[in-house]
Amino acid sequence: MDLWVVILVGVLALLAGVALGFFIARKYMMNYLKKNPPINEQMLRMMMMQMGMKPSQKKINQMMKAMENQTK
């Protein structure tokens, strides 16, 4: 085979691999976020109420800030 055919096949295979990897990773992340949604203020408020605590806005803001700092 000619050199340009080998290079063309290699580039096409690389592009196909990148595209396929992107879509597989996107599908995986969408399924992951559907099963494990990120915690928002409303969910935090419900958790505190279930634990018997009275959720004040100040406590919720502190807990949200603590979770944001923990993920950094």
From Swiss-Prot:
Predominant subcellular localization, coarse grouping: membrane
Stated name of the protein: UPF0154 protein BLi02038/BL02936
Localisation: Cell membrane
Family as reported in the entry's similarity comment: Belongs to the UPF0154 family.
Transmembrane segments: 4-24
One Gene Ontology term, aspect cellular component: plasma membrane
Keywords: Cell membrane, Membrane, Transmembrane, Transmembrane helix
Membrane-topology descriptor: Single-pass membrane protein
Organism of derivation: Bacillus licheniformis (strain ATCC 14580 / DSM 13 / JCM 2505 / CCUG 7422 / NBRC 12200 / NCIMB 9375 / NCTC 10341 / NRRL NRS-1264 / Gibson 46)
